């Protein structure tokens, strides 16, 4: 008997809700089994790296909010660290604690969206509704410090833009007290749910070797059982003073990646608690007048201060010639910024390393042999955002 099966080519996206952005995915299928998955990217390319070359170092910060727009402050953090490395400037301790505090709030902001939308893709609507309620509270904290719910533009080379408003630490403390029970509720719905496990266990497996070979990082790498976290291996700001664990998976499948993200939120809560308890008093920006604008009060009294403020925001400051690479443990993985300065007020080159770019490349090998419905599950656990992939 001859086998007369014929492969089908199927286009998914770029306007499909399950692709989490403008992903065009070309599937080569034998019946409903996937033989090849070919992702086409570039539909959200905005030339960010080139645009930054024509901006001062201060004007470049808002571009980082618009890369992975689900976790903006972590990307600002990477750029701020890179500029500080070239300037060799000291960041006040209070500013470092504020940065770490908001980086961990950003991690929760990212993971709640990922787990909620992943559950929705698989057919569970309740987790998304519950988690969006919690995300809204974090976005309010963003709004309190920066005036914006999403594109915060809050971190600065040398510190942060403004001090914490009165009462904000108490509000964050209340939030992290009531948040773990909400996570337990989500876990009670999903962890041992028969349908959830059938859709996630042994789907999209990436072995330790494959995860390393494809350049995975963050929960994608830790889900495969490799305990690599830049906050531990290459700590920045005050992460070396924080007590937390690095959760890892065993099998490298979709379920492990989901569970790693869930456990990471509990660790983020621990770090936020420590930041609130240890938060020192003091300055929130470096005292170098070349980097820090004068206060409003000084500008009302002194013409020189007014001129200084105007020059700082129009011309910016010169950064010594040199090159540096700084990376942070963003919620999706290692987000890195390579900066090359020729000594002027604008970067000669700014190369951005986005974790989602490497993760999307692995979609093909993780999808092979699975059903089409499983591809949607795998895309959800990759946690991709096209702002950072296409740049």
From Swiss-Prot:
It is a peripheral membrane protein. Disulfide bonds: none annotated. Gene3D superfamilies: Cytochrome-c3 Hydrogenase, chain B (1.10.645.10). Its EC number is 7.1.1.-. NDH-1 is composed of 14 different subunits. Subunits NuoB, C, D, E, F, and G constitute the peripheral sector of the complex. It comes from Rickettsia conorii (strain ATCC VR-613 / Malish 7). InterPro entries: NADH_Q_OxRdtase_suD, NADH_UbQ_OxRdtase_49kDa_CS, NDH1_su_D/H, NiFe-Hase_large. This is NADH-quinone oxidoreductase subunit D. NDH-1 shuttles electrons from NADH, via FMN and iron-sulfur (Fe-S) centers, to quinones in the respiratory chain. The immediate electron acceptor for the enzyme in this species is believed to be ubiquinone. Couples the redox reaction to proton translocation (for every two electrons transferred, four hydrogen ions are translocated across the cytoplasmic membrane), and thus conserves the redox energy in a proton gradient. Its main location: membrane. It is found in: Cell inner membrane. Belongs to the complex I 49 kDa subunit family. It catalyses: a quinone + NADH + 5 H(+)(in) = a quinol + NAD(+) + 4 H(+)(out). NCBIfam families: NuoD, PRK06075.1. Signal peptide: none annotated. PANTHER family: NADH DEHYDROGENASE [UBIQUINONE] IRON-SULFUR PROTEIN 2, MITOCHONDRIAL, NADH-UBIQUINONE OXIDOREDUCTASE 49 KDA SUBUNIT.
């Amino acid at each position: 008997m001859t086998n007369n099966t014929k492969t089908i080519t199927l286009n998914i996206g770029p306007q499909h809700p399950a692709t989490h952005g403008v992903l065009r995915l070309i599937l080569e299928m034998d019946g409903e089994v996937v033989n090849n998955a070919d992702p086409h990217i570039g539909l959200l390319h905005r030339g960010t790296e080139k645009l930054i070359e024509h901006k001062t170092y201060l004007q470049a910060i808002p571009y980082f909010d618009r890369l992975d727009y689900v976790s903006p402050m972590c990307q600002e953090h990477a750029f701020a660290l890179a500029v500080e490395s070239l300037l060799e400037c000291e960041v006040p301790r209070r500013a470092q604690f504020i940065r770490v505090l908001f980086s961990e709030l950003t991690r929760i902001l990212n993971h709640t969206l990922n787990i909620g939308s992943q559950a929705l893709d698989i057919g569970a609507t309740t987790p998304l509704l519950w988690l969006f309620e919690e995300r809204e509270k974090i976005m309010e904290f963003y709004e309190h410090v920066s005036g914006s719910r999403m594109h915060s533009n809050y971190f600065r080379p040398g510190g942060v833009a403004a001090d914490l408003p009165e009462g904000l630490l108490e509000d964050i403390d209340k939030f992290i007290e009531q948040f773990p029970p909400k996570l337990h509720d989500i876990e009670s719905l999903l962890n041992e749910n028969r349908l959830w496990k059938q859709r996630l266990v042994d789907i999209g497996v990436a072995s330790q070797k494959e995860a390393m070979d494809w350049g995975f990082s963050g929960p994608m790498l830790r889900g495969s059982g490799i305990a690599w976290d830049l906050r531990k291996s290459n700590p920045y700001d005050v992460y070396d003073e924080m007590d937390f664990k690095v959760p890892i998976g065993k099998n490298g499948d979709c379920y492990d990646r989901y569970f790693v993200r869930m456990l990471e939120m509990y660790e983020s809560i621990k770090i936020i608690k420590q930041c609130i308890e240890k938060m020192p008093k003091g300055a929130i920006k470096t005292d170098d007048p070349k980097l820090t604008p004068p206060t409003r009060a000084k500008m009302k009294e002194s013409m020189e201060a007014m001129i200084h403020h105007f020059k700082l925001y129009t011309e910016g400051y010169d950064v010594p010639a040199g090159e540096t690479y700084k990376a942070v443990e963003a919620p999706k993985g290692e987000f890195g910024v390579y900066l090359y300065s020729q000594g002027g007020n604008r970067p000669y080159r700014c190369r951005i390393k986005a974790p989602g770019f490497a993760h999307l490349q692995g979609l093909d090998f993780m999808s092979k042999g699975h059903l089409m419905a499983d591809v949607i599950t795998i895309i959800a656990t990759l946690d991709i955002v096209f702002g950072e992939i296409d740049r």
